[in-house]
Structure formats: structure tokens, C-alpha cells
From Swiss-Prot:
Record protein name field: Phospholipid-transporting ATPase NEO1
Lineage: Eukaryota, Fungi, Dikarya, Ascomycota, Saccharomycotina
Result, substituting residue 488 to A: Localization to the Golgi apparatus appears normal
Modified residues (Phosphoserine): 102, 551
Protein's gene: NEO1
Subcellular location, record wording: Endosome membrane; Golgi apparatus membrane
Native source organism of the sequence: Saccharomyces cerevisiae (strain ATCC 204508 / S288c)
């Protein structure tokens, strides 16, 4: 790498205190630091200069940097580890960069956090080694040019200057999902096709015809089949790409009003820093920071179903600092600092600054991500912060892994055997000829070309088209409505599933939550005793206006105490949530990220305390008994996330001027936050055994002084651009999350989905081992497993929980090695221990168990389990789920199934197949999986039989011609045989089925046979090889016997043998059909008629006069009888002696 420019020799040019001189002496250049450079500079500190660079000396709209101790730059590389250690205790300010410089003085640095110093003696040189070169013209006078990139560093945005001066600094916002362009389409597609052995083999065969010594017959005989395959594939790809381009064009040309430019421009032309106005129903064109909303509260709702698959509306709020600013102030007087682009849609760090003095933090609540939709009425004004491939939507769009079905792998193995047969047969025929000339290797090559039909070029096209047929049949099956096939390459794998990994909530259960029980330590209330709770809630308003002792409600001392406790519990439940009431067409609906929260709000409504109004600053509750409202000011909200497993809120009671911190969450985390008690763990277990999802409710009263101290430290932490979440969490823990008053416990019921019990029983009888992987508690998972019939009545459940030591994990396996009929129940902590230390030993045992239930699983553990089962067993694994936490597991499966549920469409969008209910899985596997696998297996073998039989005819003819490699069928005959004369009847096998649909559910054991792969195996393949050898030999030998090999009779022999070949294939298809339908009958008759009609046009190949004689028809009949009758007889006898299971079932079911 070239040496970096010398800063010392040019420091006067770079950092001159006179800004005008600085602007004249330094050409425009950009210094961008990539992620690696940031990491290297994290440990840099300047020993003698606590403030190395500061941003000041503003001249008009231009700002520049002053280097106070410029010589320190030259000393960077000379600092020893000792000097670094001395400076480690010195407070240093982070280097700041500025994006407002003009093009003439655009020198920028990124933030460099203070961290422990590096021990390197030349750390600055190492840091500079990560720099890249971008502007050779402007850096040429400093030595080697340097390129730096702004794409992956923190960015500072000024609406008045960034879109103008930095227009080329950030990526374009033009959307492009097209795979090809006019130049790359043909070469790219040809490469993709010819990397497959099939197509490359036939290309070589076709090209060989350009060599005179290898030329056999007509060039079209070899070019046309390959061209047909490529044309079908290229047409399909072209249509798909044109549709992608059309969708891209529509999105790119959507107009948006840009305030900073005072005109409407297409989405593709938006730049970072543009202020745009978005109206209700508009798609968000880029990642935006919400600055203003037409709602006085600054609130806006967005739909994120196209981003994360969740169907509920998300609340977004405008920055308070900018909500009431004029458009002129928004353009000229604010700046936005945004963190580097990243994938997480739930995380954003930034701040907005007004007049270079007042700042407000920015979080994900202030963002509008690209590809979401503004749902609330009115409009909003937002600033573009990320464009194009830097947006969250683009960064989370990954190219789906191309899945290859097991059947394709098996066919590929068989094709290799066929290829070996071609080589062996070619060498054998030349050997029989005695290698009589010096050009024997040319004869081998000519035989390879003649026998190329053994590897059928049309096999891939037939299978691909068949998959499309299966997908159409699945999507149009009225018994499983709204099913979507997203991956059409693996429908056959639906018939080979041996392991089913399922989520619980929303998959086996309805995800329709109802709060069934609340427990207050000494007493619990259920849905049957809600009237008692309602009575207590009635006293809520009077007890707030007057003291409870003066209340008109006469209560005993015990009931007074209980009234207080119930009141506090219900009031906390009504306040501590993120639910927002919305009105669409005068209908009240609740919007929330979790159905649990909606269930809780509906429960408080049922007992007389309903959510009346909520915005970002306040929440109002309606006391239905008195008609009065209870108003609370929302001071801070701490949303739920999968890491914290809790949510909290700070409110001020406007009537009593009291400050309260309220929190609810999982028992595993809340037990450490609430005051010590002797009942929480026991009651949590009791509720879980009832199948209820539990939440622990607590609260804490704050005095105003403590709250103000918390707010100050929390605000300071929220402005940090380094480890913001960690700093904020530390402040919350310090002031809030300890010694909470334990109010009670809620139990929410999630009912089983329709027909889950019968579906699981069917799948287990079909030989599928079912695992349930859930993030819920052990007791809840156990209860749901029993009710869903995952665990049979009386079946022993071996429980492994809280295993934290490797030796303890190993000892737990001993029992399971002995009792293979037991069910395993394991928690995530123990599972993690096995995955880390005893993966091989653990899965060697548990893959044989009928049922495994894993609780408290993380999304990554779910994915790991799927991957390990696939690796260890080699069996097909199906994963099914409905939530975002199931996506990893679904994508790691051989077959991923997503359920469109109340958690949204994220799992559905990531899956290979999307269904609406778990019970639809039985239809998908037992019926469509069976048909897809058996049909494709038969289709593949028929296509190979079609190629083998014509190759056998060619081999017999070559042997009878004294081992001369002369083509038997040439030109159109070769092309027509594989297309017009046999393709439609053979392909009609994709409509066949060997058993009625209803019987697949009555006898699910039939599915177990499919997993053994008997429909396409080496055994069945060799049966078809022998069949082809017999029929091909009969057709060719008898055709030659009825005519001769003389040139005058050659066309007669070809006429009778080719006709026999075509009719034989049509009859074989008819014999293999189990259930006839109109389409099959039409294809058989139409194909035969087409051949008959085309015969008069084949005078170049046939002796047409001979085809009108009685001898011709007599000979044809004899050939067909000898070719077909023995095969039909053998098949009938075998079926009588060894009837297949489906035949027994079909016969038994037929009245």
C-alpha cells in the first residue's frame, strides 16, 4: 500500500487559523473513515493535548477546524506504550467531523471514542493503513491519494447544505431489484445454465458436430433440444426480471414533495438531508427522521407489515425540539447526527441540534423506515437520513438461499451412473470392434454423441414445469385456502418429512389472549369472580377523591385492605402498557405490539376501567361506573424487548401530583426487581401448569427530587452516541429497578388452534417426530404439550432443567439411552450446555425420541437445533412458526412453513410455504407432499426410460452394423420424439394420484413409506434400466427382422421401429396411470393423432409406401405385443403377490 501523505510537511496548508487562507490553499477532498479505521482509532489519545480538534470559527455557513497542537499529529506514531498509559487517565474529547464544509474545505473526521490505549508503538500508522483512496486529483500534491468512505460512519446532516454539497457522498436512492440488464442478461444466464452438468454435456455434444470427423446426422438433432431447454428457462427469467423492473420503476417514480427544493421529485432522486412531506397512505421512500406531525402531539402511526411482517400499527413521535418549528427553521437552523447505517430495525441512535446549542436525542421512536406506510391521517415532515442500500429495508433484504430438494439430489446421483454407462457402452462397442483402426478414440467420441439421449436434456425442464404444477395445485386447494408457495423448487420434500419442529404461541395456539386470572399473593380472581373485582373498581374514584375511610362504600377492615390491593393492581394494569386506542370508521380498535397487552387492557375494561385516550404525553382512563376520567401524565416509557423481557412506565397522577414507576415482565427477571416474597415462584408455577402465560406486576412511588435526578442522568445518557443503551440501562437500574412493590401476577390464556390435537396425532401416526421449541416457561410448555397430545396420556416425561455444568449435562443422558419411548422436556439453559459441550452425544440420543419439548429457547437455539438435526440424521426437517423469532429456524429448515398470525407476516414471508392454520399442515404433507414426490419420481423415471430405450435401439443397430457409429434416427425424429410425440402424455403423469385424498388422513401410515424413498431408488432405477433394455432390444431387433439393414430398406426399418417406439411409450404411460382424468385421456389421443397426421411430412425419413401395407401394421402389432405384454404380465403378477400398501387401502375402501 502507498505511504500516506505527510501531515507535518503540509500542516500549514491543512490547518491555518486564517479560514480564508485555509480555503484558498486546500483543494476539495474528503476524508472518510471506514469501520476498520474507526476500530483502529478507538484507542488513540493525544498525550499533550486534551482537546486536539475543536469545531468552531464559523464564517457564514462555513465551518472549519483549528488544530491547536498540530505537532501532535506527527507525534502519534512515536508514542510509546508508556506514554499511552500516562494519557489513559486524561479526559479527552472525541474527534468530531463536520458535513457543512463547502467543496473547497471539506476535511472531515469521524467520532473516535476514548478507550484504553493500544500497546502498539506505531498505532497511528496502523490506523492510517486502513484508509482508502477517493480523490486522486486533490490528494496528488500530498503524495499518495486517499479514499475514505462515509457510508459506514456516523453522519451529520444539515438540510440546507447536505443535499447540495454532499449529493455524491451517499448512495443513490434508486431501487433496483433486477437481476440482469441488457448487457449481462445473456452471458449471466448462459453461465448459470451451463454450470449444470446436464446442459454443459449437451453443449459439448452439440459443438462436437462442428468437427467433421464427429458429425453424426443433422446438427439440428442436437441443437434443437438444448435450445428448447434454454429458451424456456431464459423466457421465464426474462419475464420475472421484466416484472421486477416494472415494480422498481413504479416505486422509483413515485413523487414526493421536497420542502428544501420546493418541488415534487421522484423517489429515486431523493438525497440525504432532504426534508420531505409525507401524507396518509404514502409509502416511506427512504429512512427518515420524523421532525413534525400534523397532530399537535407530534404522533404518527405507520404500518410496517412490508418491513417486519407485523400487522399492528407502530406509534412514531416527532422530536419535541422540531415539532413546532417553522419550515425555514427546519431547513436552516437544525442539524441531525445519525449513527452509521445498520441492519437492526429496532435500534437507532442520533440527536437533533437547534441553532448549534439545544439538542434532543433521537431513537427508533423518531424514525420512519423505508417501505413502511404512513397510516395516520394528516401529514408529517421528515428528513432523509439513509438512502438506497443504506436503508434498513435494503440491509435486511438478503438473497434467499436456493434450496435443493432431496429428489433432485437422488436424480443427480442416478445421472452420474447413467453417464458412466454411456462411457462404458461406448468403450465396449469399440472394444468389440477390436480397435481396428488408429482413429478408435474418434469412434468412442461418436458413440458418446449417439448415446447422449441416455442423459435426457429435457429432464430438468420436465421437473421444473412439474413443480409449477404442484405449486398451482397447492395454492388452489380449497381445503387449505390462502396457502402460498414461496419456494417452488422443493414441493417433493413435503412428502419426505421426518422431523417437524414447531413453535408454540400462535402456531399450536391461537395467539388470541384472554386474561383468565390475577393473583395477589393471598387471593386470586378468575373470570368467574370478575364481579367482585368490578365492585372494588367502583370504589376507585371515591377513594381517590375522598379518603377510603370516608367513602360511602361500607367495607370491613379486610375488604378495605383487599380493595386497596385490587385497585392498585387494576390501575397499574390499565396504565402500564403500550396500547393506543384508535378509531377507524368510528370503530374503536387497540393497537399494540403484543396481544398480551391488548388482553390486559380489555380485561381492565371489562371490570370498569377502560383506556379512553392516550398520546405520547398523557393517558386517560374512563371510570365507567361514575363516568369520570383519571388523567396521568406520561413522563417516560421503557418499551418491552426480548432482551429485557419487561416494560415500564413513569407517570404523574395529575390529581394527586404523585410520581409512580410501574413495571411488568417475565418472572425470571422481575423476581430480582421486586421486594422479597414467599409466594411468587410457587404461584407462577401453578399458573404455568394451568397453561397460562404469566406476567409479574410491580410499582414504585418516586419523590419529585429522585425523579428529577433520574431524568437528568437519563437525558444525558440518551444523548450519548457511544453505548447509549448500556448507559441508559444503568441509570434505570440505579434509580428505578429495585425494591418494587409486588402487586400481583396475571395469567393469560392462549387457546389451542382449531384441530391441533387431531393434526398432531395424524402427523405422529405418519411417522413424523414432532419437537416443540418455545420461549415460554417449562410448566406452560408441559401443559400445552399434554393438551395438544404431543405427550401421550401416561407417557413418561424426562425433564432436564437448570443444567449449568458440563458433567451434569452428560449424566442426564443415561436414562434416555435406555428408555427411547420417553418424552424429553428441556429448558434453553440446559440445551445451550448440550449444544456447546455434548452436541454429538445429545443428538445421537434425542433424535430417536418420539417427542422433544424445548422451553425458554432463543431464536438462535431454534435455528441451531434444526441445523444439527439435518446434519446428524440426513433426514428432511420441516420447521413451522408464526413470529419474527421463528424466522431463523424456518430459514434453516429443509422445508420452512410460516403461519400468517396475529404477530404478523414475518415468518410467512420468510417461509417456503405460507398457511393460515396449523391443521392445514396435514393436507400439505399427507396429500400434496405425497402426490408431489410420487409424481416427480415417476416422471423422472419415465423421462430417463424414454432416453434409455432410444439409446438401446441405437446400440442394437450399431452392433448389427458391425459396430459402426452410424445414427439410426436423425433430424426431426430425434427432436420430435422427446417433444411433440411423447412429452405431453409423459408430463400428464403430474396429474395422477394413487389414492383418494380422504384415505391419506384415515391411513396416515402410508406417509411413512414415502420417507424411505422407495418411489425413486437405485432398485427402481435398475428395474427401469432392465425394462428399457428389454423393450429397446425387442423393438430394434424385430424391426430389423421384418425389414433389413440394406440402404433400400433402411427407411422401412426406421419407419416401423420409430413408430413402435412412439406407440410403446404411449402405452407404457397408460399402464402406469392410477387415476384417469380428461386431461390424461386427451393428451394420449391428441399425441397419437398428431403423430399420424405428421407421418406424411416425414418422407425423408420413412418409406411412406411401406407404411400403407399390411406387413407394416402386422409387424408393428407383433413388436408392440412382445414389448408390452410380458411387462404388463410381470407387473400384474408382482402386484398380486406383493400388493403395495396404497393398493390394499384403496381396495379395502372401495365398496
Amino acid at each position: 500500500m502507498p505511504n500516506p501523505p505527510s501531515f507535518k510537511s503540509h500542516k500549514q496548508n491543512l490547518f491555518n487559523s486564517n479560514n480564508n487562507q485555509h480555503a484558498n490553499s486546500v483543494d476539495s477532498f474528503d476524508l472518510h473513515l471506514d469501520d476498520s479505521f474507526d476500530a483502529a482509532l478507538d484507542s488513540l489519545q493525544i498525550n499533550n493535548n486534551p482537546e486536539p480538534l475543536s469545531k468552531h470559527n464559523t464564517v457564514g455557513d462555513r465551518e472549519s477546524f483549528e488544530m491547536r497542537t498540530v505537532d501532535d499529529l506527527d507525534n502519534f506514531s512515536n508514542h510509546s506504550s508508556d506514554s499511552h498509559r500516562k494519557s489513559s487517565n486524561t479526559d479527552t474529547h472525541p474527534l468530531m467531523y463536520d458535513n457543512r464544509l463547502s467543496q473547497d474545505d471539506n476535511f472531515k473526521f469521524t467520532n473516535i471514542a476514548s478507550s484504553p490505549p493500544s500497546s502498539s508503538n506505531n498505532i497511528f500508522s496502523k490506523a492510517l493503513s486502513y484508509l482508502k483512496v477517493s480523490n486522486t486529483k486533490n490528494w496528488s500534491k500530498f503524495g499518495s491519494p486517499i479514499e475514505l468512505s462515509d457510508q459506514h460512519i456516523e453522519r451529520e446532516i444539515h438540510p440546507d447544505t447536505t443535499p447540495v454539497y454532499d449529493r455524491n457522498r451517499y448512495v443513490s436512492n434508486e431501487l433496483s431489484n433486477a437481476k440482469y440488464n441488457a448487457v449481462t442478461f445473456v452471458p449471466t444466464l448462459l453461465y448459470e445454465q451451463f454450470k449444470f452438468f446436464y446442459n454443459l454435456y449437451f453443449l459439448v455434444v452439440a459443438l462436437s458436430q462442428a468437427v467433421p470427423a464427429l458429425r453424426i446426422g443433422y446438427l439440428s438433432s442436437y441443437i434443437v433440444p438444448l435450445a428448447f431447454v434454454l429458451t424456456v428457462t431464459m423466457a421465464k427469467e426474462a419475464i420475472d426480471d421484466i416484472q421486477r423492473r416494472r415494480r422498481d420503476r413504479e416505486s422509483n417514480n413515485e413523487l414526493y414533495h421536497v420542502i428544501t427544493r420546493n418541488r415534487s421529485i421522484p423517489s429515486k432522486d431523493l438525497k440525504v438531508g432532504d426534508l420531505i412531506k409525507v401524507h396518509k397512505g404514502d409509502r416511506i421512500p427512504a429512512d427518515l427522521v420524523l421532525l413534525q406531525s400534523s397532530e399537535p402531539s407530534g404522533e404518527s402511526f405507520i404500518k410496517t407489515d412490508q418491513l417486519d411482517g407485523e400487522t399492528d400499527w407502530k406509534l412514531r413521535v416527532a422530536c419535541p425540539l422540531t415539532q413546532n418549528l417553522s419550515e425555514n427553521d427546519l431547513i436552516n437552523r437544525i442539524s441531525i447526527t445519525a449513527s452509521a447505517p445498520e441492519k437492526s430495525i429496532h435500534k437507532f441512535l442520533g440527536k437533533v441540534t437547534y441553532k448549534d446549542s439545544t439538542s434532543n436525542p433521537l431513537s427508533v421512536d423518531n424514525t420512519l423506515w423505508a417501505n413502511t406506510v404512513l397510516a395516520s391521517s394528516g401529514f408529517c415532515i421528515a428528513c432523509v437520513v439513509y438512502t438506497g442500500r443504506d436503508t434498513r429495508q435494503a440491509m435486511n433484504t438478503t438473497t434467499a438461499k436456493v434450496k435443493t430438494g432431496l429428489l433432485e439430489l437422488e436424480i443427480n446421483s442416478i445421472s452420474k451412473i447413467l453417464c458412466a454407462c454411456v462411457f462404458a457402452l461406448s468403450i465396449l462397442l469399440v472394444a468389440f470392434a477390436g480397435f481396428h483402426n488408429d482413429d478408435w478414440y474418434i469412434d468412442i467420441l461418436r458413440y458418446l454423441i449417439l448415446f447422449s439421449t441416455i442423459i435426457p436434456v429435457s429432464l430438468r425442464v420436465n421437473l421444473d414445469l412439474a413443480k409449477s404444477v404442484y405449486a398451482h395445485q397447492i395454492e388452489h386447494d380449497k381445503t387449505i385456502p390462502e396457502t402460498i408457495v414461496r419456494t417452488s423448487t422443493i414441493p417433493e420434500d413435503l412428502g419426505r418429512i421426518e422431523y417437524l419442529l414447531s413453535d408454540k404461541t400462535g402456531t399450536l395456539t391461537q395467539n388470541d389472549m384472554q386474561l383468565k386470572k390475577i393473583h395477589l399473593g393471598t387471593v386470586s380472581y378468575t373470570s368467574e369472580t370478575l364481579d367482585i373485582v368490578s365492585d372494588y373498581v367502583q370504589s376507585l374514584v371515591s377513594s381517590k377523591n375522598d379518603s377510603l375511610n370516608n367513602s360511602k362504600v361500607a367495607l370491613s377492615t379486610t375488604r378495605k385492605d383487599m380493595s386497596f390491593r385490587v385497585r392498585d393492581m387494576i390501575l397499574t394494569l390499565a396504565i402500564c402498557h403500550n396500547v393506543t386506542p384508535t378509531f377507524e370508521d368510528d370503530e374503536l380498535t387497540y393497537q399494540a405490539a403484543s396481544p398480551d397487552e391488548i388482553a390486559i387492557v380489555k380485561f381492565t375494561e371489562s371490570v370498569g376501567l377502560s383506556l379512553f385516550k392516550r398520546d405520547r404525553h398523557s393517558i386517560s382512563l374512563l371510570h365507567e361506573h361514575s363516568g369520570k376520567t383519571l388523567n396521568y401524565e406520561i413522563l417516560q416509557v421503557f418499551p418491552f424487548n426480548s432482551d429485557s423481557k419487561r416494560m415500564g412506565i413513569i407517570v404523574r397522577d395529575e390529581q394527586l401530583d404523585e410520581y409512580w414507576f410501574m413495571q411488568k415482565g417475565a418472572d425470571t427477571v422481575m423476581s430480582k426487581i421486586v421486594e422479597s416474597n414467599d409466594w411468587l415462584e410457587e404461584e407462577t408455577g401453578n399458573m404455568a401448569r394451568e397453561g397460562l402465560r404469566t406476567l409479574v406486576i410491580g410499582r414504585k412511588k418516586l419523590n419529585k427530587k429522585i425523579y428529577e435526578q433520574f431524568q437528568k442522568e437519563y437525558n444525558d445518557a440518551s444523548l450519548s452516541m457511544l453505548n447509549r443503551d448500556q448507559q441508559m440501562s444503568q441509570v434505570i437500574t440505579k434509580y428505578l429497578e429495585h425494591d418494587l412493590e409486588l402487586l400481583g401476577l396475571t395469567g393469560v390464556e392462549d387457546k389451542l388452534q382449531k384441530d391441533v390435537k387431531s393434526s398432531i396425532e395424524l402427523l405422529r401416526n405418519a411417522g413424523i417426530k414432532i419437537w416443540m421449541l418455545t420461549g415460554d416457561k417449562v410448566e406452560t410448555a408441559r401443559c400445552v404439550s399434554i393438551s395438544a397430545k404431543l405427550i401421550s396420556r401416561g407417557q413418561y416425561v424426562h425433564t432436564i432443567t437448570k443444567v449449568t455444568r458440563p458433567e451434569g449435562a452428560f449424566n442426564q443422558l443415561e436414562y434416555l439411552k435406555i428408555n427411547r419411548n420417553a418424552c424429553l422436556l428441556i429448558d434453553g439453559e440446559s440445551l445451550g450446555m448440550f449444544l456447546k459441550h455434548y452436541e454429538q452425544e445429545f443428538f445421537d440420543v434425542v433424535v430417536h425420541l418420539p417427542t422433544v419439548i424445548a422451553c425458554r429457547c432463543t431464536p438462535q437455539q431454534k435455528a441451531d437445533v434444526a441445523l444439527v438435526i439435518r446434519k446428524m440424521t440426513g433426514k428432511r426437517v420441516c420447521c413451522i412458526g408464526d413470529g419474527g423469532n421463528d424466522v431463523s429456524m424456518i430459514q434453516c429448515a429443509d422445508v420452512g412453513v410460516g403461519i400468517v398470525g396475529k404477530e404478523g407476516k414475518q415468518a410467512s414471508l420468510a417461509a417456503d410455504f405460507s398457511i393460515t392454520q396449523f391443521c392445514h399442515l396435514t393436507e400439505l404433507l399427507l396429500w400434496h407432499g405425497r402426490n408431489s414426490y410420487k409424481r416427480s419420481a415417476k416422471l423422472a423415471q419415465f423421462v430417463m426410460h424414454r432416453g434409455l430405450i432410444i439409446a438401446i435401439c441405437q446400440a442394437v443397430y450399431s452392433i448389427c452394423s458391425l459396430f459402426e457409429p452410424i445414427a439410426l434416427y436423425q433430424g426431426w425424429l430425434m427432436v420430435g420424439y422427446a417433444t411433440c410425440y411423447t412429452m405431453a402424455p409423459v408430463f400428464s403423469l403430474t396429474l395422477d394420484h394413487d389414492i383418494e385424498e380422504s384415505l391419506t388422513k384415515i391411513y396416515p401410515e402410508l406417509y411413512k413409506e414415502l420417507t424411505e424413498g422407495k418411489s425413486l431408488s437405485y432398485k427402481t432405477f435398475f428395474v427401469w434400466v432392465l425394462l428399457s433394455l428389454f423393450q429397446g432390444s425387442v423393438i430394434q431387433l424385430f424391426s430389423q427382422a421384418f425389414t433389413s439393414l440394406l440402404d433400400t430398406d433402411f427407411t422401412r426399418m426406421v419407419a416401423i421401429s420409430f413408430t413402435a417406439l412412439v406407440v410403446n411409450e404411449l402405452i407404457m404411460v397408460a399402464l402406469e396411470i392410477y387415476t384417469w382424468n380428461k386431461t390424461m385421456l386427451v393428451t394420449e389421443i391428441a399425441t397419437l393423432l398428431f403423430y399420424i397426421v405428421s407421418v406424411p411430412f416425414l418422407g425423408d425419413y420413412f418409406d411412406l409406401g411401406y407404411m400403407t401395407t399390411v406387413n407394416y401394421y402386422a409387424g408393428l402389432l407383433v413388436i408392440l405385443l412382445i414389448s408390452i405384454f410380458p411387462v404388463w404380465t410381470a407387473k400384474a403378477i408382482y402386484r398380486r403377490l406383493h400388493p403395495p400398501s396404497y393398493a390394499k387401502v384403496q381396495e379395502f375402501a372401495t365398496p
